[in-house]
């Protein structure tokens, strides 16, 4: 199932499952996480692997009425986490974003979704709690207990089964693939920055 929701509805849903999400995460010895993905599909193809899908026009869809449900979105990191996906990037990779790159509407929508979900779960919007799949696959939150790195740029398993979702966005702020950038141009840095902007605007 999928259902379109507003930001206010989503925040209430996340608030209602806060205790359950925290309990799940703490059972794994960690705090809750929010993981950001692309679906590698078209702009309007919704996938049940993610709690939240954002279509090309920036609309927000949930695939479960219970955001504490464990979904299959981030290998060995699913328990006590929320999976959010942009419906885009079919055929995308490190050299290009495919025929459906992230839209401006999706980028702004996901930033607002991050703000609302993190607020409801009492999470700071930082890399310890909010990560792209690429960052998570590279253990950039410092948690090395889940798996070895399997990022596009750090395939420690050597099997080619790697991830780099949203490592770059194809925008002026995040124009190209550069996982070693320190200038704030990586996709995760841009999205967290935008989410904190929206958070600060709401609290002003």
Q: Could you tell me what each predicted segment is?
A:
Residues 1-78, 157, 173-175:
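N-terminal catalytic cores of peptidoglycan-degrading enzymes
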Residues 1-28, 92-204:
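Basic/polar, cationic surfaces and motifs that engage anionic cell-wall
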Residues 33, 81-83, 129-131:
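Structural preference for beta-strand elements that scaffold enzyme active sites
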Residues 76-87:
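Short coil-to-beta-strand
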Residues 40, 66, 88-90, 134-136:
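A mature extracytoplasmic/lumenal domain signature
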Residues 47, 79, 105, 109:
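Short, well-structured alpha-helical interface segments that form or flank functional binding sites
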Residues 64-69, 82-83, 115-118:
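Short C-terminal domain-edge/linker segments immediately following a structured domain
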């Amino acid at each position: 199932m999928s259902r379109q929701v507003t930001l206010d509805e989503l925040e209430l849903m996340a608030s209602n499952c806060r205790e359950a999400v925290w309990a799940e995460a703490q059972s794994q010895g960690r705090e809750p996480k929010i993981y950001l993905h692309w679906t590698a599909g078209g702009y309007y193809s919704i996938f049940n692997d993610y709690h939240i899908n954002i279509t090309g026009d920036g609309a927000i869809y949930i695939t479960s009425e219970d955001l504490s449900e464990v979904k299959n979105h981030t290998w060995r990191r699913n328990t006590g986490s929320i999976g959010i996906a942009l419906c885009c990037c079919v055929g995308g990779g490190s050299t290009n974003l495919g025929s459906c790159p992230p839209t401006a509407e999706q980028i702004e929508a996901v930033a607002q979704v991050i703000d609302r979900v993190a607020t409801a779960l009492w999470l700071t919007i930082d890399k310890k709690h909010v990560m792209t799949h690429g960052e998570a696959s590279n253990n950039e939150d410092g948690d090395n207990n889940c798996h070895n790195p399997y990022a596009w740029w750090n395939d420690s398993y050597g099997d080619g089964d790697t991830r780099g979702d949203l490592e770059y966005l194809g925008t002026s702020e995040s124009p190209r693939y550069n996982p070693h950038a320190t200038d704030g141009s990586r996709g995760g840095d841009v999205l967290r920055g935008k989410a904190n902007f929206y958070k600060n605007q709401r609290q002003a």
